[in-house]
Design a protein with these regions (language model features):
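Amphipathic alpha-helical dimerization/coiled-coil segments
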Residues: 80-122
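C-terminal regulatory/effector modules of DNA-binding transcriptional regulators
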Residues: 167-291
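Glycine-centered, phosphate/nucleic-acid-interacting loop/turn motifs that mediate DNA/RNA or nucleotide
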Residues: 52
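Short, Lys/Arg-rich nucleic-acid/phosphate-binding segment
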Residues: 58-64
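Short amphipathic alpha-helical interaction segments
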Residues: 36-47
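Short acidic, hydrophobic short linear motifs in intrinsically disordered regions
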Residues: 18-31
Length: 291
């Protein structure tokens, strides 16, 4: 497990919902039981700060970390997919995006951001996604100051191409077979926990926190390589749908006990972390507040 990636998940899933800042010692405490030692934590947050993901504030000998503005925006794009309830309809439309003047130093970050928006390369220099909205593209172009360096077009499928042919094209270019195997592994890893909770077994706050962090980390890792495709373009019994339903249900089960751990064991400059932001309860279509 990559320490840097896990720490990004910690900030995106947890810290962003509880004040946006955390003490370095609490970061180490959060991931210690998951095999990330203190030395690796310090090295990882230093590198994440250097790469522009995190910013640091120091008070005496203590360091407190939070997302940078750009780091927070990047994760927010991911969050729109991670915590989606699914079920979006599709009317056969496609968005095509062709960078015409992309500076070399922006290339990797821009393409990663395109991936989170659901775009994939379909030919040299052309990216496509089914459906989608213009606002997310406009925000991305504004962020990278590329409004004059990118061509955006819309296309539509017709009856000249059958759904079977479209599914074959998507399966090949989106590499669905590899993704489906990853989703199966995710389901195999977390379904036993869901079954145990359904039978009335209670998760201790620290265990719920660790399970929640691992769930979102593994789910995010797969989504980074997946594109949110409509059901019309997916294979029958697509395991990505099963994985999303499992993640949604399990996250709801773990929300209350994991939040208990977060607010009693982790600290920032003001002391214990504050209550969850209101939009935390909108994740996965709605999470019930603890009584």
């Amino acid at each position: 497990m990559r320490a840097k990636s896990l720490i990004i998940t910690l900030f995106g899933d947890v810290i962003s919902q509880h004040g946006g800042e955390i003490w370095l010692g609490s970061i180490a405490k959060s991931v210690d039981a998951l095999g990330i030692n203190d030395r690796l934590v310090r090295t990882s947050v230093f590198r994440l700060a250097k790469e522009g993901w995190l910013e640091v504030e120091r008070e005496g000998r203590k360091s407190f970390y939070g997302f940078t503005r750009s780091g927070g925006k990047e994760y927010q794009r991911a969050a729109q997919r991670i915590y989606s309830a699914g079920g979006d309809s599709w009317r056969g439309g496609w968005q095509l995006l062709m960078p015409t003047n992309l500076p070399e130093h922006l290339r990797d970050d821009f393409r990663r951001s395109l991936t989170w928006l659901g775009f994939r390369p379909i030919s040299n220099g052309t990216f496509a996604r089914p459906g989608g909205d213009e606002e997310s593209i406009r925000d991305l172009l504004d962020e990278f100051d590329l409004s004059s360096g990118v061509v955006v077009m819309e296309a539509k499928t017709t009856a000249l191409t059958t759904s079977k042919e479209w599914r074959a094209i998507v399966s090949e270019h989106w590499q669905l077979s590899h993704l489906e195997e990853d989703y199966r592994q995710l389901i195999g890893l977390f379904r036993p926990l869901k079954k145990a909770l359904d039978k009335g077994q209670l998760a201790a706050p620290v265990e719920a926190f660790q399970a929640r962090l691992l769930l979102i980390h593994e789910y995010r890792r797969i989504l980074l390589r997946d594109t949110p495709l409509p059901n019309d373009l997916l294979p029958n019994r697509w395991q990505g749908t099963v994985a999303r339903q499992l993640a949604q249900a399990l996250y709801r089960d773990l929300a209350a006990p994991s939040t208990n751990y977060i607010q009693t064991e982790l600290v920032n400059r003001q002391g214990r972390l504050p209550e969850s932001e209101h939009y935390f309860y909108e994740r996965f279509g709605g999470i019930a507040k603890a009584p």
